[in-house]
Design a protein with these regions (language model features):
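Short beta-strand-turn/beta-hairpin segments enriched in glycine/proline and small hydrophobics
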Residues: 2-18, 34-50, 77
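Short, well-structured beta-strand-loop connectors
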Residues: 24-35, 62-72
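Short histidine-centered loop motifs in beta-beta connectors
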Residues: 13, 20-24, 28, 57-60
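Short hydrophobic interaction/assembly module
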Residues: 49-77
Length: 77
């Protein structure tokens, strides 16, 4: 989701456990870079960046349980 002036919100597509966070705030990312690794029903699901930019904010940490639609990170320009 892109909110004008706020960056691109990377959201979880399902209820899952956060296994790993692969990026940090202020880190530069490219399209296809792995941002977060989720686990649901014994399957690992990598969350990839859909745009290039700088990580403005990471909203989750390993061990967190996220809901569908929950914001994982925000990517700025």
């Amino acid at each position: 989701t892109n909110l004008s002036g706020m960056g691109h919100r990377v959201e979880s597509e399902l209820v899952a456990n956060v296994i790993a966070v692969q990026v940090a705030a202020d880190q530069q990312v490219a399209v296809g870079d792995e941002l977060v690794l989720l686990e649901s029903m014994k399957m690992e699901i990598p969350v990839l960046s859909e745009r290039s930019g700088r990580v403005a904010e990471v909203k989750v940490a390993p061990g967190d349980v996220v809901q569908e639609g929950e914001v994982l990170a925000v990517i700025g320009d």
